[in-house]
């Protein structure tokens, strides 16, 4: 109770002073409340007065009619939303004009230049004055005509809308006109072709029958729309897809699409009366799809239609139809259960119009989900014919939506029919077969070969006997030892058939030395690369430090390793054990908690490595840009080097940059870095959009990896470039914006959080050195020309090849450090460690890289740039050693 003594004494007051204090407090509180209420009332009165004044001002505004220019621009923005919408309107005009050849030329995704030319009926000279005015058409005279409309256009808004958001030029000629006429349009009116000319009348000129419409500087007067459509690659892809859709629906019409200045078309169909939809699908999407197409025809009035009859249904067949309540017919091309793709291809034409139907698309996807693997999609092309009286086409400004009578029942009918056909096809599987030559008996091959060998042996013995008995007979030429070739490129050693994992475990190729001799390019402060991938920070003092004690990456030495977590310095120093190696008494130290141990490696491979396909048939590429890049290296092949790489025999690795090979009687030295870079460049193009994937056990933060790369002298970063964190943040956002393209075509998987999930598997069983992963991402973001398709793909493939090549720099540096340590450490121990690591790398080069050289198309520059150098010949060696 002593603490009570320290408390201050209570102050006592009389009752009068207490009452006075209470009264004073009450008066003060009352005054404060009164003041607050007054202020609140004043504020409320001010707000009410302001709102009342605003209402009075709003009521004074008069309703007025919008000017025609404003109305036209609003309408143009609804009808022409992007270049593909403009092209769709122009394509339909060409088809309405009965054209048989349609050529489209674009630049910058149609934003800068879009031109379409046909050989249709053309535009009369008398009509050129009003052809671009709003609500002018030759296909509709009264509203009731919509009930029987057979043409695509009917509103007369397409050319008018285009002329209000671009510079429009028309060159046209009718069959009965002696010459062609050209005119320029702006805001729906004729305009002089140049400021120097005053007349805007159409000018006569030379031309062929048909119409050529040129659209330049689309959305030049609507900068907000133009800024939204900056991705010209995406716009160009939409145009390509649109052309393919119309080409399939109109197989008798020739469609040609090409970029301005490029003579090679990206889309080209021959057309002709004998051309069928299936042929067009095969030419545009590949024969692998066309072989798996099922033609499904639905006619409620004919329960057993013949799928082979009348492959081209025209819109005129719906006239005078006498069907039941579901008055429609359908013909569709559906992929079977043997085909699937990463992206769905759903194409729907109703009465010849390209439209969207989410209900029908979703319903058919549900049907296919029962037969296709998860994450894959089918190909569906549907042509639906409905009487015009049962369809409302005037629903959407872009005509992309329509309303059909009894839509739900029609969709259900189609679902049942497709499900029935797919259930039948799911019971069969298509396999490729090889046709045997006539008279070829495969079962008797072995016996016939044995008989042939026995007969040859007998004849040889007989010949030998005759030669011995007859001294005058001619002798066989003698083969000297110096001329005998004892190697064969077709023969294989026993270790080639061993599992690569077992091979490395048996040889302990992933053993680390506890003296810190390994040279790594970065360490993880938290003890694992996964921590950095999850947003952890890298140690800036250990990144790209050649003198640090980081572990050397084991990806090159271990052909099946994926991204191995890098231990921190503290973890590596915690514990070590001594392991006795092979035939010598030399010992090498390793850490029991290191990922290089057998159990840890096995665990890592189970979680991070995806075994690729053993055999591969390259997917047929349809993109013109990729075909061009492939043809470039295939047309630049050195025939002599092609034969050299097909038949050369691996001798051994001279160091981490060069390998020795034998070809015939000659010994060559080849540059592994140059040749493997070209190899992975070609393989990446051949495997375009068909890569296997190497998955990381834990996603890696791209932002952190980019910061790591910027700390490297290889990045070329300077202070004038700006802060590293801002650069890394900008480049991360850039790569995230391109993640769909990178994943679709190259299996470089990036998630929404800006983390790297996986990289492509370019060569089966081969994993690149992940030490170079930060620089790879930096180069991918900065060295690729994203705006143009061909340059974009070429740049990405170039960076992939640089990432996957046999890169000797850090391995050479490691050997240099090991050699330096020989002066202070045991020479036998150091040499043994170096031998183990080199042996694992040599296995990869011999059994993974060298077999792939047979797929290489060596360029002609390899003959002169030092990639292949002749060292000596058997004749020269025999002059020195006189023996094999």
UniProtKB/Swiss-Prot annotation:
Subunit-structure text: Heterodimer of mlh1 and pms1 (MutL alpha), and mlh1 and mlh3 (MutL gamma). Forms a ternary complex with MutS alpha (msh2-msh6) or MutS beta (msh2-msh3). Interacts with exo1.
Cystine residue pairs: none
Regions of compositional bias (Basic and acidic residues) in chain numbering: 473-489
Alphabetical list of Gene3D superfamilies matching this protein: 3.30.230.10, Histidine kinase-like ATPase, C-terminal domain (3.30.565.10)
Region annotation Disordered: where it falls in the sequence: 1-21, 297-318, 442-522, 544-605
Main location: nucleus
GO annotation terms (biological process): mismatch repair
UniProt biased composition (Low complexity): 446-472, 577-590
Family classification: Belongs to the DNA mismatch repair MutL/HexB family.
Encoding gene, per UniProt annotation: mlh1
InterPro entries, per the entry: DNA_mismatch_repair_CS, DNA_mismatch_S5_2-like, HATPase_C_sf, Mlh1_C, MutL/Mlh/PMS, MutL/Mlh/Pms-like, Ribosomal_Su5_D2-typ_SF, Ribsml_uS5_D2-typ_fold_subgr
Record protein name field: DNA mismatch repair protein Mlh1
Presence of the UniProt keyword Iron-sulfur in the record: no
Molecular function terms, GO-annotated: ATP binding; ATP hydrolysis activity; ATP-dependent DNA damage sensor activity; mismatched DNA binding; MutSalpha complex binding
Gene Ontology cellular component terms for the protein in this record: MutLalpha complex
Function: Heterodimerizes with pms1 to form MutL alpha, a component of the post-replicative DNA mismatch repair system (MMR). DNA repair is initiated by MutS alpha (msh2-msh6) or MutS beta (msh2-msh3) binding to a dsDNA mismatch, then MutL alpha is recruited to the heteroduplex. Assembly of the MutL-MutS-heteroduplex ternary complex in presence of rfc and pcna is sufficient to activate endonuclease activity of pms1. It introduces single-strand breaks near the mismatch and thus generates new entry points for the exonuclease exo1 to degrade the strand containing the mismatch.
Sorted UniProt keywords: Cell cycle, DNA damage, DNA repair, Nucleus
Subcellular location: Nucleus
CDD domains, sorted: HATPase_MutL-MLH-PMS-like
Superkingdom of origin organism: Eukaryota
Keyword Secreted: no
